[in-house]
C-alpha cells in the first residue's frame, strides 16, 4: 500500500523494497475494491517476477494461492491462530467459506482437532485448497469440499464441536446451516464488518435470529480482529 502522494514513485519504491527483502520475488499493488461473487480483487505487478501466484507463510503453514482469483487476507493471520488455540483436543471443526484453506490448515496445524472440514464455492480457491492440504501434509486431518454450503451442509451426517464462518459480510444469513450441524454446546465463530456502535446491536440481532431458528445461543465474546476502515472493525 503506497500513499497517493507517492504514486508516481511506486515502481521505484517497489524495486527498493525487493532489494531490501531478499526473500521476496514480486511486489504488487492491490486494488481497494473487492468485486464479484467471490470477493476477489485486481493487483498490479510493480517489480520482480511477472506472476500473481504466491506462497504465503503463516502460523506454521504454507498457503499457495493466486492473488486475483482467490479471496485472502493476510491480516487475519492472528485471528486464525486465535481460533486454533481455542480448539480442544478431539474437536471436529467445520469451516464454511474456507477459500484456499487458511483456516482449516492453521487450525489443524496448531491444535489437536480430530478433523477439520472446509467448504468452498469458488472452484479456483478449492483447487488451491486441495493442493495446500497436500503441501502441508495434512490430508489425514483436513477434508475440503467444493460447493455451495446451502447444498453441501444439510446432507452431512456428522455434527461439529466448532463452526467457523469467515465470511466478512452477510454471515448471519447462514446461521441456520451452522446451527443445523452444531453439536449441543458447540462454539460458532461469526464475522462481520461493524462500526463501534453497531457491535452490541448486532450481537442482539444474532441472538434473535438463532432464537427464531429454535436454537437459543449465548454470546460468549465479541472480539475486534481487524480494522476495515477508520471506526469500522471486523
Where are these regions (language model features)?
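SAM-dependent transferase fold signal centered on methyltransferase-like domains
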Residues: 1-234
Amino acid at each position: 500500500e503506497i500513499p497517493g502522494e507517492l504514486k508516481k514513485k511506486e515502481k521505484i519504491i517497489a524495486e527498493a523494497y525487493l532489494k531490501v527483502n531478499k526473500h521476496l520475488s514480486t511486489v504488487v499493488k492491490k486494488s481497494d475494491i473487492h468485486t464479484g461473487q467471490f470477493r476477489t480483487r485486481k493487483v498490479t505487478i510493480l517489480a520482480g517476477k511477472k506472476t500473481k501466484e504466491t506462497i504465503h507463510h503463516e502460523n506454521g503453514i504454507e498457503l499457495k494461492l493466486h492473488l486475483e482469483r482467490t479471496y485472502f487476507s493476510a491480516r487475519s493471520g492472528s485471528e486464525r491462530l486465535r481460533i486454533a488455540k481455542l480448539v480442544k483436543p478431539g474437536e471436529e471443526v467445520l469451516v464454511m467459506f474456507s477459500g484456499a484453506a487458511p483456516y482449516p490448515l492453521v487450525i489443524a496445524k496448531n491444535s489437536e482437532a480430530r478433523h477439520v472440514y472446509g467448504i468452498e464455492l469458488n472452484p479456483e480457491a478449492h483447487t488451491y485448497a486441495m493442493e495446500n492440504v497436500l503441501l502441508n501434509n495434512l490430508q489425514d486431518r483436513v477434508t475440503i469440499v467444493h460447493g455451495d454450503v446451502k447444498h453441501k451442509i444439510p446432507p452431512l451426517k456428522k455434527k461439529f464441536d466448532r463452526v467457523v464462518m469467515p465470511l466478512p459480510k452477510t454471515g448471519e444469513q447462514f446461521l441456520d446451516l451452522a446451527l443445523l450441524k452444531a453439536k449441543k454446546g458447540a462454539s460458532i465463530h461469526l464475522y462481520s464488518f461493524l462500526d463501534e456502535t453497531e457491535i452490541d446491536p448486532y450481537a442482539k440481532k444474532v441472538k434473535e435470529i438463532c432464537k427464531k431458528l429454535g436454537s437459543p445461543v449465548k454470546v460468549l465474546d465479541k472480539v475486534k480482529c481487524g480494522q476495515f476502515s477508520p471506526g469500522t472493525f471486523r
